[in-house]
UniProtKB/Swiss-Prot annotation:
Signal peptide: none annotated. The lineage of its organism: Eukaryota, Metazoa, Chordata, Craniata, Vertebrata. Residues 44-56 have a biased composition (Gly residues). Residues 8-21, 28-42 have a biased composition (Basic and acidic residues). The keyword Metal-binding does not apply. This is Leucine rich adaptor protein 1-like. The keyword Acetylation applies. GO terms for biological process: positive regulation of canonical NF-kappaB signal transduction. Keywords: Acetylation.
Amino acid sequence: MEDSPLPDLRDIELKLGRKVPESLVRSLRGEEPVPRERDRDPCGGSGGGGGGGGGCSSSSSYCSFPPSLSSSSSSSPTSGSPRGSHSSALERLETKLHLLRQEMVNLRATDVRLMRQLLVINESIESIKWMIEEKATITSRGSSLSGSLCSLLESQSTSLRGSYNSLHDGSDGLDGISVGSYLDTLADDVPGHQTPSDLDQFSDSSLIEDSQALHKRPKLDSEYYCFG
């Protein structure tokens, strides 16, 4: 009876990251397991039932086997067939592969959920950053407008206060003469306007003419009366 072909274990080794044990490979091949040092004959014999070439008899007190080892050695070689052990090993391997596939599916689903959560967190961070930038821009604009308005109000109040103080301040050295001279200069600029100095000159000339006329009239009367 031919054995089924041995499955390729390289994919399993790559997924698990470790090499498949030799005992599992031998069990899949249908080979008998290699006995360990403790399972061998302590007296150097072959472990069979013959007494000729063993160098030690089973009835000897120095080479007596424990009951568990003797029972296992008597039942293990002939109890199970290689075909049954091979099928049981394949079933165990398929079960482990199925569990491994399920774990990989669960890991992928978890990875997808984590990626979605990271995307949501990233979008939230970007929206918060945008809101902070917009708020900073609006605040800077409002502060600049309020600063310009305050500076304008301060300049207006300062100019009005300065003009009011200049009007009501008598310590600037102005007197009536300086004000009159200033008014005279303004009147010179206006055509046809007579200044107080012009009026004074007019009144002086009229008085002189009147006095001259009064002095001339008696002379005429005296001359008239003389000739008469």
